[in-house]
Amino acid sequence: ITNFIKKNYEKKKILFVCGPGNNGMDGKLAYNKLSKKFDVSIFTIDRNHKINFNKLKNLIKNTEIIFDCIFGTGLNKKIRGNNKKIIELINKSNKQIVAVDIPSGLSGDSGQRMGTCIQADTTLAMGFLKPGYFLQPAKEFIGKLELLNLGLPLPKFKPNIKLVNKKNIENIPSQNSSINKYDKGHVLVI
């Protein structure tokens, strides 16, 4: 994350919004590494969900880029309460939004919204691509997808899905990105 920021956002005001889990820890570590040389701020969401919304609104007002480190691929329940309000506030901010791992509120496996979710301009895939990035409706919330090399060996597993590239589908006519198999009556499985 820090290398990505150094390469792309050196002179920008950045706000890390960090949740209570591992994704939040990634944001806190990046903030700590950058805090001496970059214009960065942090807002943390504790497990008790005590939220100072005035502080968050002020931080958002005075930043250019928001890094969404609230929830990652481990999210397994619907977004509710203050977490929902925080995500809605970020989405309404008209600021550039970078999601770490996956936009908060999306399932990394199914691509489904878990209630509400972050509308990211960029998503930083941490180490490897998750299936949910390429499925609907997540595809519409991911923005530009950047794969970050974490310098760790990839897990040894045989994927049960494959990513098809443009070369594989040159002769298939393009369609609306939200189309599904029921809209046309036929499905082509590759």
Indicate where each model-derived feature is located:
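Walker A (P-loop) phosphate-binding motif
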Residues: 16, 187-190
